[in-house]
From Swiss-Prot:
Family named by the database record: Belongs to the IspD/TarI cytidylyltransferase family. IspD subfamily.
Enzyme Commission number(s) from the entry: 2.7.7.60
Keywords (A to Z) from UniProt: Isoprene biosynthesis, Nucleotidyltransferase, Transferase
Function: Catalyzes the formation of 4-diphosphocytidyl-2-C-methyl-D-erythritol from CTP and 2-C-methyl-D-erythritol 4-phosphate (MEP).
GO biological process: isopentenyl diphosphate biosynthetic process, methylerythritol 4-phosphate pathway
UniProt name for this protein: 2-C-methyl-D-erythritol 4-phosphate cytidylyltransferase
Catalysed reactions, as listed in the record: 2-C-methyl-D-erythritol 4-phosphate + CTP + H(+) = 4-CDP-2-C-methyl-D-erythritol + diphosphate
NCBIfam families hit by this protein: ispD
Lineage top rank: taxon: Bacteria
Site label Transition state stabilizer, positions: R18, K25
Keyword Membrane carried by entry: no
Length: 238
C-alpha cells in the first residue's frame, strides 16, 4: 500500500500590521534570509514532506525578488483571510493527500516536532493534530470592554496552539468550506475541524517554535535559529 503524500501549505498572504514594518513580516530579514525563506527551507528539507505550496497575495511585490520560484514549490493566490489562503492551497490536492499547514512567520519549527506530528497519519483515534505547548502562566479573564479581571481561568488542560497543523486534505477542505459558508470564526485549521465534529490531537512541541508577530520577536527568533543551525552542524559532524 502506497503511503499518503504529505503536502505542506504555507499561507503567506498576510500583511502583519502589528510588526509596523515597511513590508509584510514574512519578508523581513533574519540571519541573512527572509523569514519566509527560512520557513520554506525548513519544510523542503524535511524528508517526510513531499511537496510545498505557498499562498501569496495577489500583487505581492516581494516574492519574485527572492528567486523562490526556482525552488521546488508551487505558488497559488492567497485569499482575504487565512482560511481562504489555506483553502486555495489545498484545492489541487489529491484525495489521499495530507495537508500540513504551517504559518509563514514560524521559521524556527523543529524537524523532530514535525516528525512527531506526522506520526499521527494512520491513527484510528483522531482525524489529525496540531503542535502545541501547555499554558504555563496564570490566565486571567477580563470583563467585557474593560481591563478589570473577572476571574482566574484554570490553566489545567489549556494549550497554546502552534503550527504545523495536520489533517487529511479532503476533510480539511470540506471543513473550511462549511465553516466559511456558515460564517464561523476560523482562527486556525483545527478550529474548522472542531466545528465539523472531528477529533483533533495535541502534540507537544518546542516553545522555540514562536510566531513572529512583534518587533521584539525578531531577536528571539534569530537566537533560536542560530541554536537550530548549530545543532544541525554538530549532528552532521558526528
Amino acid at each position: 500500500m502506497t503511503s499518503p503524500r504529505v503536502v505542506a501549505v504555507i499561507p503567506a498572504a498576510g500583511v502583519g500590521s502589528r510588526m509596523q514594518a515597511d513590508r509584510p513580516k514574512q519578508y523581513l530579514s533574519l540571519n541573512g534570509k527572509t523569514i519566509l525563506e527560512h520557513t520554506i527551507d525548513a519544510l523542503l528539507n524535511h524528508p517526510l514532506i513531499d511537496d510545498v505550496i505557498v499562498a501569496i497575495s495577489q500583487g505581492d511585490e516581494y516574492f519574485d525578488q527572492l528567486g523562490l520560484r526556482q525552488k521546488p514549490i508551487r505558488v497559488v493566490d492567497g485569499g482575504k483571510e487565512r482560511a481562504d489562503s489555506v483553502l486555495n492551497g489545498i484545492l489541487s490536492l489529491d484525495e489521499n493527500d495530507w495537508a500540513l499547514v504551517h504559518d509563514a512567520a514560524r521559521p524556527c519549527v523543529d524537524d523532530a516536532d514535525i516528525s512527531n506530528l506526522l506520526s499521527l497519519i494512520g491513527s484510528e483515534d483522531v482525524t489529525g493534530g496540531i503542535l502545541a505547548t501547555p499554558v504555563r502562566d496564570t490566565m486571567k479573564r477580563v470583563k467585557p470592554s474593560s481591563n478589570i479581571i473577572s476571574h482566574t481561568e484554570d490553566r489545567n488542560g489549556l494549550w497554546h496552539a502552534l503550527t504545523p497543523q495536520l489533517f487529511p486534505a479532503m476533510l480539511l477542505k470540506r471543513a473550511l468550506q462549511e465553516g466559511l459558508a456558515q460564517g464561523v470564526s476560523i482562527t486556525d485549521e483545527a478550529s474548522a475541524m472542531e466545528f465539523a465534529g472531528h477529533s483533533v490531537a495535541m502534540v507537544s512541541g518546542s516553545p522555540a517554535n514562536i510566531k513572529i508577530t512583534h518587533p521584539a520577536d525578531l531577536p528571539l527568533a534569530e537566537f533560536y535559529l542560530k541554536q537550530k543551525f548549530s545543532a544541525q552542524g554538530d549532528s552532521a559532524k558526528n
